[in-house]
Amino acid sequence: YIKDMGKLERHEQVQADIESGLVASRNLALTQRAVFLDRDGVINIDSDLVKHPDEMVLYPDATKSIQALHSAGFVVVVVTNQSVVARGLTDLKGVEAIHARMERLLAEEGAFVDQISFCPHHPDKGYPEEVPAFKIECHCRKPKPGMLLDAASRFNIDCSNSWMVGDSERDILAGQAAGCRTIRVKTGHGLKPSTVVPDAHAAGIWEATTHILAAK
């Protein structure tokens, strides 16, 4: 549980969270519920491979969605494939700078995520700009569940009581492989045909959030 309580209204919110049991429930000795969020097309507008911090533009409902999930006691983890590293379009520091901008934009409206996990790999080889060290088969690239399972281990997450929200087939497959319930949003690549069936569909991150809160 993290909260800046330097202002009176924030102090009052922390006091309310203590009295409601929210603070105690975030003790990692206790099993946690989580919402795993894909990044591009869910939290931010997918501009076809985000390569620079200036290309990080949040969806209008992203901040209030993440705030609502935290208020309900969920751990919020971003799990994102970032093959821009393997393709040589940016490097690890570049991705970290993009994430720093995302976190700053969220923080400006009072929201935060508990962890950002990203996979820099891509299995396909033969492109001129590619970085060979990252052109490998790995356990973390979705649709494999590695990023979700690693976060589950760190935060003591019960995946059977958690959700994966994504816009692509690989997001849903990763969530299912980890044992999570899944929601596919219609933003980003969410309208592309797929034979993979999620537990629910949603117009965007806010509708996905309201579905999760109603189901808990």
Predicted regions and their residues:
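Conserved alpha/beta core of the MobA/IspD/sugar-nucleotide pyrophosphorylase nucleotidyltransferase superfamily
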Residues: 1-30
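Active-site neighborhood of HAD-like aspartate-dependent phosphohydrolases
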Residues: 31-77
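Metal-dependent phosphoesterase signature
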Residues: 44-59, 85-93, 108-109, 131-140
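Conserved Lys-Pro-Asp/Glu-containing loop-to-beta segment of HAD-superfamily phosphomonoesterases
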Residues: 131-133, 139-169
